[in-house]
């Protein structure tokens, strides 16, 4: 906790800070070295399953995993708190994305160590509950945080990303749950929950978009 607090103090624009999350059952491997999101509509934990030494640098990340993070309260008061619709899965990506729109940063503090049991609540990496609510919340998060033109810009990538995931979960025997989640995501997308577009945030959207593209490369090659 001390290491994360000190990291927040070092970075005045930081909204959140995440610890280095190590797999509880294999303490030589990372569980999460910072959360990232890409134009395919995929969120991912950096270097998951790799050696813990691969994420030693304190640096900016797309968002902090709420499993081991701290947040600056005064920023919550400006941008709003966690969305109750995101009661499970991607709630941390959603709030971190929103903070980025407002010009804040999310940081990774490798000196702060947490041993994490992945999927400790849902029980397994792939199950009906997790599959349905992850796809649901992903659609909802995109709707909330991307202006209409940005959605159009990313649409070809999103179609590929969601199509690939659909095929993946069909092969896992979870295709029905994944598609049901997508449908539910559209159903809960309400205009009053969308982050209001403001001209003062234009450059923040540009920076986010460049990172969304770059993170596709990061996902497969880094």
Predicted regions and their residues:
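Conserved donor NDP-sugar-binding/catalytic core segment of glycosyltransferases
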Residues: 1-42
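Alpha-helical elements of Rossmann-like donor-binding domains used by nucleotide-donor carbohydrate transfer enzymes
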Residues: 3-6, 94-95, 137, 177-184
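A short, conserved alpha-helix in the catalytic core of glycosyltransferases
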Residues: 3-4, 62-113
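Catalytic beta-strand/loop signature of glycosyltransferases that borders the donor
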Residues: 20, 106-118, 128, 153
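A recurrent flexible, glycine/aromatic-enriched loop bordering the glycosyltransferase active site
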Residues: 30-31, 42-43, 50-74, 88, ...
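Nucleotide-sugar-dependent glycosyltransferase catalytic core
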Residues: 115-136, 169-176
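Non-catalytic, C-terminal membrane-associated alpha-helical segments of glycosyltransferases
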Residues: 151-222
């Amino acid at each position: 906790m001390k290491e994360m607090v000190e990291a927040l103090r070092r970075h005045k624009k930081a909204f959140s800070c995440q610890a280095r999350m190590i797999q509880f059952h294999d303490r030589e491997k990372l569980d999460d070295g910072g959360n990232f999101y890409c134009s395919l509509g995929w969120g991912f934990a950096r270097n998951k399953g790799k050696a813990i030494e691969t994420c030693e640098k304190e640096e900016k990340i797309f968002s902090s995993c709420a499993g081991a993070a701290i947040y600056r309260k005064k920023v919550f008061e400006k941008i709003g708190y966690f969305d109750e619709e995101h009661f499970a899965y991607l709630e941390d990506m959603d709030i971190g994305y929103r903070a980025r729109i407002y010009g804040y940063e999310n940081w990774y503090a490798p000196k702060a160590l947490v041993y994490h049991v992945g999927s400790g609540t849902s029980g397994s990496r792939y199950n009906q509950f997790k599959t349905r609510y992850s796809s649901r919340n992903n659609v909802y998060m995109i709707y909330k945080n991307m202006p209409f033109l940005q959605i159009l810009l990313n649409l070809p990538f999103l179609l590929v990303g969601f199509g690939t995931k659909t095929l993946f979960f069909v092969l896992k025997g979870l295709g029905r749950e994944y598609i049901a989640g997508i449908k539910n995501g559209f159903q809960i997308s309400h205009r009053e929950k969308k982050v209001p577009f403001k001209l003062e945030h234009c450059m923040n959207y540009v920076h986010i978009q460049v990172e969304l593209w770059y993170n596709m490369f990061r996902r497969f090659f880094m």
